[in-house]
């Protein structure tokens, strides 16, 4: 049974966004050259090109991780990134063969999956290093890992100012091979704050410290790569591209607010539904739970089968709009679990079955568009939340991939 509310995912747009990001990086690299870190010779990976870690955690930001990962693999993503081992296993079972990095904390009970499914862990604490070392010894294998440095966000990672005390045993672990070092910015999307530059300084100092600790070739790969830039940092400052960047939101055609971008991107997802009922509301009557919308004149409403169980935020009422017949109409009344109502007064002949665009564009000649950034700004949140919250009962329908990229058609 097909529900009326559907998320349409354009894999060709996804692949085009990936290629546009790669072209942006290559063009800027050619113009500016590779940023260097004085004193970090052993940590400098190959200068060109900047590699891309495609972030597909959280079900590919709500877009459907299996199909998205296959599409990104087909156009040459160097690495895919998941939040945990469980997410990565889903991708492997879907046929994804590209290297997969686990960003988040590791569960000891899941560590066998690193070896069974050829995954790359992040090590962010001495305890994590000991656990992975023990698991690797049990499997009689050496495993490559990425080392996370906490440069001020105070979440996961080895503190940048305490590395000589905390890292020695990790770097000496016989079954662990250091492949990359990374950090994460707390304020990359806040251009007015100086903390971004402080974190960059802390990270580059940490790279020098680790270099001075003599990470030898027996414990490291041929190049110890560096990465720090998420989508916002990629747009903000080419000095933090280092050897790899980690676009997430940009891949899905959304620019992190309040930043702007010269990269030509296309939103990958649209969210549509259908009118299921049209109601006449008399003056003085209310609409929805709590009767929070009260008509002060004759009003016509349309009922849409999408509610908070589908990821529609309660705050959209009175703040956001949808598109019907190429026109914006406001959401009114409290959003229900399975439904919401919109005011279609003055819109002629609205009928059950009419298309409703919640996110996306509608119209031919004078088309209108509502995107995740607009919706997020209206309710005081971030576009990440808008797309990530689209519920599991909403079917994802996939459009094709770029010509020749048949792998992602599975």
What kind of feature is each model-predicted range?
Residues 1-15, 19-23, 86-87, 106-108, ...:
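Active-site anion/phosphate-binding pocket segments in diverse small-molecule metabolic enzymes
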Residues 33-35, 43, 172, 213, ...:
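Intrinsically disordered, low-complexity segments enriched in Ser/Pro/Gly/Ala and basic residues
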Residues 5-13, 23, 29, 47-214, ...:
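Active-site-proximal beta-alpha core segment in soluble small-molecule metabolic enzymes
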Residues 17-18, 28-31:
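A broad helix-preferring feature
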């Amino acid at each position: 049974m097909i529900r009326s509310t559907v998320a349409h995912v354009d894999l060709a747009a996804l692949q085009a966004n990936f290629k546009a990001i790669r072209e942006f990086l290559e063009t800027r690299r050619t113009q500016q050259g590779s940023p260097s870190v004085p004193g970090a010779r052993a940590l400098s990976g190959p200068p060109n090109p900047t590699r891309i870690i495609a972030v597909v955690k959280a079900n590919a930001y709500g877009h459907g991780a299996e199909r998205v990962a296959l599409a990104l693999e087909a156009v040459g993503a160097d690495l895919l990134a998941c939040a945990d081992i469980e997410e990565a296993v889903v991708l492997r079972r879907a046929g994804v063969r590209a290297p997969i990095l686990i960003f988040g904390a590791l569960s000891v009970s899941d560590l066998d999956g690193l070896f069974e499914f050829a995954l790359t862990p992040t090590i962010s604490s001495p305890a994590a290093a000991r656990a992975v070392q023990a698991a690797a010894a049990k499997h009689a294998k050496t495993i490559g890992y990425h080392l996370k440095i906490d440069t001020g966000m105070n979440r996961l990672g080895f503190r940048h100012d305490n590395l000589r005390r905390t890292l020695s045993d990790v770097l000496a672990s016989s079954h662990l091979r250091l492949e990359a070092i990374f950090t994460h910015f707390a304020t990359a999307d806040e251009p007015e704050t100086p903390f971004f530059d402080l974190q960059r300084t802390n990270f580059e100092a940490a790279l020098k410290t680790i270099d001075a600790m003599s990470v030898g070739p027996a414990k490291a790969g041929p190049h110890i790569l560096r990465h720090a830039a998420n989508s916002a940092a990629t747009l903000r400052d080419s000095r933090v591209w280092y050897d790899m960047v980690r676009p997430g939101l940009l891949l899905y055609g959304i620019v992190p607010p309040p930043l702007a971008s010269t990269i030509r991107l296309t939103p990958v997802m649209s969210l549509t539904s259908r009118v299921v009922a049209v109601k006449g509301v008399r003056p003085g009557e209310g609409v929805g739970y709590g009767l929070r919308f009260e008509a002060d004149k004759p009003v016509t409403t349309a009922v849409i089968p999408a509610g908070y169980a589908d990821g529609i935020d309660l705050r959209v009422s009175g703040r956001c709009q949808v598109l019907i017949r190429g026109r914006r109409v406001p959401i009114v009344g409290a959003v229900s679990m399975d439904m919401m109502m919109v005011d279609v007064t003055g819109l002629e002949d609205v009928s059950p079955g009419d298309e409703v665009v919640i996110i996306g564009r509608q119209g031919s000649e004078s088309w209108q568009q509502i995107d995740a950034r607009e919706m997020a700004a209206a309710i005081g949140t971030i576009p990440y939340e808008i797309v990530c919250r689209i519920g599991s009962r909403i079917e994802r329908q996939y459009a094709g991939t770029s010509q020749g990229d048949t792998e992602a058609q599975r």
